[in-house]
């Protein structure tokens, strides 16, 4: 019997607001414990929430960016549960009337096939506090309590852990590019839970699902889903009964561990939040928000392929971050040579950034400077090899290519007469070149070219050197 996995993801993203969802406390990350709090986010008696309009706006913006239908009349609800990091003993969230429904994300599989992953709903809610486990006991920090979130719930359309990673990667790039969330997994502003079940391949009914928490990286997501698939297959194969449960990923031991039996919706006793008014969203406001959405990464990638003729792979890599996409876009327009711009950014510039642990926004030279480097190489002022050295100086000093070329005397030698003299000198000193060439070993010409380039310290035009070496060898 062959099994397949059925996977759905629930992704929580903290919204880019200055204040919390129901009060004026700051959302700044990293403050001293329990300093970004007030009676409202601590749930003290008599305090009343007031919805931050910016939260609703960003929720709608996320829905539009993810191809969702927007709910025109909605409400907030109470989700009742007890946990030490939930100060009110309930969370204000959305149940029956989420702000967005029925969206989708298209992912491109390794085969080149485009697969559509449905989005069931997006709702806005407040975050809980944070528990800190120590040897002395468990401490609680309420700074995060009340920080605004959206929860993006996918449909169970994902079939492999690799598809889950592609989906989450694209979701993160959209939310980040649209300035909805900074999506920093290391700070907890993007968190992902996975629901996974198995079934016999080719059948329709869903199996018994487990929810997996604590997947705080893309690698953890893929490893946890792979482990859970194997665990469930082994259990079913051995005749064991699966149960609906919540598990957490144990990074140290590379396995999932049972936390509790999975709750059902009625366990939370949802009911409308009476302290907040009904949400009314007009068509005019939706269009205003739609107009604030920038060109999204996948749209940029499509444009780079159509407008610049880039391969899909190049376009994908260049749009992994907005900064890199914008840098390339400007350089491509200024240089008129998109492929050269792509090669420099994906090649030598990325290598230098990796070596120095910097980002493209930290570069000391502008897209205009890179376009100038492409131009001087194309014009024959310097060779590609010298261009790599010039780039290293640009990276270190921030000077323009022409300034570096002038200061270091790097202009390419295009004087055919002078180069021909050097070619003959090299051939005279290395008679074996002629002998081997005449016997059919034409690759020996590369040695002669290399010797000429060595004599000129790399400044002779390699195209001219190649031509003259061939001419002079043929004469002898």
From Swiss-Prot:
EC number: 6.3.5.-
Record flagged with keyword Chloroplast: no
SMART domains recorded: GatB_Yqey
Pfam families the record matches: GatB_N (PF02934), GatB_Yqey (PF02637)
Keyword match Nucleotide-binding: yes
Catalytic activity from the UniProt record: L-glutamyl-tRNA(Gln) + L-glutamine + ATP + H2O = L-glutaminyl-tRNA(Gln) + L-glutamate + ADP + phosphate + H(+); L-aspartyl-tRNA(Asn) + L-glutamine + ATP + H2O = L-asparaginyl-tRNA(Asn) + L-glutamate + ADP + phosphate + 2 H(+)
GO BP of this protein: glutaminyl-tRNAGln biosynthesis via transamidation; translation
Annotated GO MF terms: asparaginyl-tRNA synthase (glutamine-hydrolyzing) activity; ATP binding; glutaminyl-tRNA synthase (glutamine-hydrolyzing) activity
Keywords, ordered alphabetically: ATP-binding, Ligase, Nucleotide-binding, Protein biosynthesis
Domain of life: Bacteria
Record-linked Gene3D superfamilies: 1.10.10.410, GatB domain, N-terminal subdomain
Function: Allows the formation of correctly charged Asn-tRNA(Asn) or Gln-tRNA(Gln) through the transamidation of misacylated Asp-tRNA(Asn) or Glu-tRNA(Gln) in organisms which lack either or both of asparaginyl-tRNA or glutaminyl-tRNA synthetases. The reaction takes place in the presence of glutamine and ATP through an activated phospho-Asp-tRNA(Asn) or phospho-Glu-tRNA(Gln).
Family: Belongs to the GatB/GatE family. GatB subfamily.
Assembly behavior: Heterotrimer of A, B and C subunits.
Protein name in UniProt: Aspartyl/glutamyl-tRNA(Asn/Gln) amidotransferase subunit B
Taxonomic lineage: Bacteria, Bacillati, Bacillota, Clostridia, Eubacteriales
Gene: gatB
């Amino acid at each position: 019997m062959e099994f397949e996995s059925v996977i759905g993801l629930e992704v929580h993203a903290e919204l880019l607001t200055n204040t919390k969802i129901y009060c004026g406390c700051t959302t700044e990350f990293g403050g001293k414990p329990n300093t970004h709090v007030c009676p409202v986010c601590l749930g003290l008696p008599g305090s009343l929430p007031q919805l931050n309009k910016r939260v609703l706006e960003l929720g709608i913006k996320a829905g539009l960016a993810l191809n969702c239908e927007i709910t025109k009349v909605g409400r907030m609800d109470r989700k009742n549960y007890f946990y030490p990091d939930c100060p009110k003993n309930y969370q204000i969230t959305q149940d029956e009337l989420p702000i967005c429904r029925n969206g989708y994300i298209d992912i491109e599989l390794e085969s080149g096939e485009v697969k559509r992953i449905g989005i069931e709903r997006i709702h806005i809610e407040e975050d809980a506090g944070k528990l800190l486990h120590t040897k002395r006991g468990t401490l609680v920090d309420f700074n995060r309590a009340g920080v605004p979130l959206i929860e993006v719930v996918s449909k169970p359309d994902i079939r492999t852990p690799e598809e889950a990673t592609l989906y989450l990667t694209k979701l993160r790039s959209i939310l980040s590019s649209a300035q909805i969330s900074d999506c920093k997994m290391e700070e907890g502003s993007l968190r992902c839970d996975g629901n996974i079940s198995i079934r016999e391949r080719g059948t329709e009914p869903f199996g018994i699902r487990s929810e997996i928490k604590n997947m705080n990286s893309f690698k953890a997501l893929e490893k946890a889903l792979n482990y859970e698939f194997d665990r469930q297959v082994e259990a079913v194969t051995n005749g064991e009964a699966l149960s609906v449960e919540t598990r957490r990923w144990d990074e140290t031991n590379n396995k999932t561990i049972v936390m509790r039996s999975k709750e059902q919706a009625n366990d939370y006793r949802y009911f409308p939040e009476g302290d907040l008014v009904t949400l009314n969203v007009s068509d005019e406001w939706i269009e205003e928000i739609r107009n604030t959405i920038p060109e999204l990464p996948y749209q940029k990638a499509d444009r780079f392929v159509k407008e610049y003729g880039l391969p899909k792979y190049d376009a994908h890599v260049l749009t992994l971050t907005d900064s890199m996409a914008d840098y390339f876009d400007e350089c491509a327009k200024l240089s008129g040579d998109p492929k050269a711009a792509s090669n420099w950014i994906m090649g030598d510039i990325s290598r230098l950034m990796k070596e120095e642990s910097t980002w493209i926004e930290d570069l000391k030279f502008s897209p205009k400077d890179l376009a100038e480097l492409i131009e001087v190489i194309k014009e024959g002022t310097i060779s590609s090899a010298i261009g790599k050295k010039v780039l290293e100086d640009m990276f270190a000093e921030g000077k323009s290519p022409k300034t570096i070329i002038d200061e270091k005397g790097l202009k390419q030698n295009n004087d055919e007469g002078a180069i021909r003299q050097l070619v003959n000198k090299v051939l005279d000193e290395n008679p074996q070149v002629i002998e081997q060439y005449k016997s059919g070993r034409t690759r020996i010409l590369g040695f002669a070219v290399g010797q000429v380039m060595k004599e000129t310290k790399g400044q002779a035009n390699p195209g001219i050197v190649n031509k003259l070496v061939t001419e002079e060898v043929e004469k002898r």
